[in-house]
Amino acid sequence: MPVYNVEAFLEPCVRSIIGQTYRRLEIILVDDGSPDNCPQLCEQWAQKDERIRVLHKENGGLSDARNAGLRAATGEFVLFVDSDDWIAPEMAEKMLDAMVEYKADMVLCQYTEVFPNGKMLRKYDGKRAVRVYGRQEMFKLLLEDLEVTNHVWRRLYKRKLLPENLFPVGKNFEDMYVMAELTEKCETFVSLNDVYYYYRANPDGIMKTKTSKNLNDYLDALEKSHADICRFCPEMPKAMQDSMRRMRGLTATYLWEDVLVVPTLTSEERKQIRERVDKWADMLPEEVPGFNARQRTYYRLFQENDLRAARIWYELWFNQNNWWCHLKKAVKRAVPLLARNAAEDTFS
């Protein structure tokens, strides 16, 4: 478990791990040069529970910390937990049971997203208690990014699948970099319908922070993931091809949108990202599989480089609350002015 600047969340996370119903755990806390009290708190936890080992290292980022934990791990199975999240008490036991019962290489559980206001949202609600997939089915699910996302947490892995330097150091979206490679190593993949992982949504996290590095890292990761899947599935069925095209079309649309609306990007950064996305989108068909009418319209406006119309379309369809607020403010200001001007015309 990588630990960095999570003093407020560390205790509930560690408590959820040491409270697992499956007791034979090796718990590795990797202090990634955290500037707060986390290093001392980790040592205090190690004194309370002999299963806990603490590694202290210079700050190298999430990937570097995860790699350090992997190098230190001695168990047959590996479970990743982020230090601002928490897990259900039965998570390790239930997932290990499924691993053994189905002779699986990887087991996935469902998760709930927890927002700062305390609201919780279950991210996926399947109809079957357990689903067992082969490798090609798993690749298709990764492309759809619904039930099977690219997160490395909420999964139990056989240790032999994971090289010691699995994650790319210095890159964000490291999960997406490695998931296709891990999937290729699996024969059997099990997806449980139960929620065992609680993901704490961070409004200031990497996923929400739109910098030039983050946007380029995201494109790098997605391109590598898709290249890996194409390499592992050279005779890709049409359904998988459509899923990949739809994902690329959605990503192109989202990044075009970021170029339009993110205020922190410089003009040079906007140009660089726009050129990169344009080059990527040129490889897509004019009709992206699975797009609805609103998405098709938005996509075509970008393809035709009509950015002004695209911005209006974005505000009208994808940012309706903000658009409605602006309209109400405009009406509130304009109506009294209109009435006053009409009165002046009447008496003049």
Language model segments and positions:
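Short, well-formed alpha-helical segments that are part of the catalytic scaffolds
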Residues: N5-G19
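Short alpha-helix within the catalytic core of nucleotide-sugar-dependent glycosyltransferases
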Residues: E11-R15, P39-E43, N67, G75, ...
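A conserved acidic beta->alpha catalytic loop
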Residues: S16, D31-Q40, E58
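A short, glycine-/small-residue-rich helix N-cap motif at loop->alpha-helix starts
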Residues: E58-D64, L70-A73, K171-N172
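Donor-binding/catalytic cores of nucleotide-activated saccharide
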Residues: L62, S83-V190, R200-K213
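Short aromatic/hydrophobic "clamp" motif used to bind/position activated sugar donors
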Residues: V78
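Catalytic core of nucleotide-sugar-dependent glycosyltransferases
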Residues: Y196-N202, T209-M236, T253-P285
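Membrane-interface aromatic/basic loop that binds lipid-linked glycans or pyrophosphate carriers
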Residues: V261-S348
